[in-house]
């Protein structure tokens, strides 16, 4: 082989080897890119629903940049799936209640700009709990606080803060309302906000920050709602509303709302005679409410709401240790599970209870005559046995030397069960404390516990003599 042939042969071999190497490099690059995208690939969305990506879980759309052999490849990672809540887990088994939160609003008002409020409540989204209240359009150390004992004025708004944050000047005013309810369906907040003339009020339905629907007064006599959280199951929320006499026959309706739009309205049925200010909780697949009979009974009405067919039933808590105020002494109070007991039915106070098998957990003022003190306990057979009075696990939340007020329930979903929590409104000022011209409140919050617990009292704690008049 002459020199030229040798050079040509060596060149051909080198070119072949270079070509093979280039093809291998391209194959490796293609394989790497394919594997990378498959690792983060989203399944095809069904019904325009966003599906989760694995193994990366994020809350917002971001762009991931991957560098491979100096080549930049951009691929959008799918957002985390957001689902409606269904509350299908069992109820937590508890031994009692433990302290959770206290906002000290009145004490702080002695030296700071804190809203005048009443009708507080608590509700949680899937990640965080919030406190709500109806503001009076003024701070406490402000001449506008004079006369805030009145319930319904056009300046009242629904306030919303993270639980434990008092209603300071930076607090968001969610809507215009002198009666309200709020709940989170897993995707967004629903607020039911009632305001307007006593004889022709309007309820606005605000979902995800937008007004979606409304309804006007149907009995022209103070349309009103729960003053605590509503409940949403699989995207449908339900709220109890009443229009009519506060001390006689009224027209109660149960509304079903989907993403802010009213989809159905059911009339009250069953044996309950008067319904106001219900405290509702999920009892999958349905919803149960414990309410206030402001007409005939000091035993509390129960509403069972079927979320599938919109049917309604009602009755009364069986416990002979009744939950409303005013009420008879425990030795003479009664309840037959079906009817109001006709014992000091008027006026009443918002309260709560929840079933635990055949038993019932409940809270009430310690005083049988006024809104002072607060206690909780379980009544054995209190959900199933008429006039049951066997009380266990009693706790004092506020001693009887201090004022309480409204109370209500809210539910918190844990890893394995749904816990029941409650708040107590701690009212200060008028009508009981006439040294000042205002009426406002703070709150204390407890949640169910399966552990042990001690004793104490958690009143508002403000010295009325330190407060602005």
Curated annotation (Swiss-Prot):
Disulfide bonds join 92-417, 124-129, 183-230, 232-237, 278-291, 280-289, 318-337, 421-447. HAMAP family: INFV_NRAM (MF_04071). N-glycosylated. Residues 91-469 are annotated as: Head of neuraminidase. The gene is NA. The chain crosses the membrane at residues 7-29. Intact N-terminus is essential for virion morphogenesis. Possesses two apical sorting signals, one in the ectodomain, which is likely to be a glycan, and the other in the transmembrane domain. The transmembrane domain also plays a role in lipid raft association. InterPro entries: Glyco_hydro_34, Sialidase_Influenza_A/B, Sialidase_sf. Catalyzes the removal of terminal sialic acid residues from viral and cellular glycoconjugates. Cleaves off the terminal sialic acids on the glycosylated HA during virus budding to facilitate virus release. Additionally helps virus spread through the circulation by further removing sialic acids from the cell surface. These cleavages prevent self-aggregation and ensure the efficient spread of the progeny virus from cell to cell. Otherwise, infection would be limited to one round of replication. Residues 36-88 are annotated as: Hypervariable stalk region. The influenza A genome consist of 8 RNA segments. Genetic variation of hemagglutinin and/or neuraminidase genes results in the emergence of new influenza strains. The mechanism of variation can be the result of point mutations or the result of genetic reassortment between segments of two different strains. This is Neuraminidase. It is a single-pass type II membrane protein. Inhibited by the neuraminidase inhibitors zanamivir (Relenza) and oseltamivir (Tamiflu). These drugs interfere with the release of progeny virus from infected cells and are effective against all influenza strains. Resistance to neuraminidase inhibitors is quite rare. The lineage of its organism: Viruses, Riboviria, Orthornavirae, Negarnaviricota, Polyploviricotina. It catalyses: Hydrolysis of alpha-(2->3)-, alpha-(2->6)-, alpha-(2->8)- glycosidic linkages of terminal sialic acid residues in oligosaccharides, glycoproteins, glycolipids, colominic acid and synthetic substrates. The active site is at residues 151, 406. Ca(2+) binds at residues 293, 297, 324. Residues 1-6 are intravirion. Glycans are attached at residues 61, 69-70, 86, 146, 200, 234, 402. The keyword Ion transport does not apply.
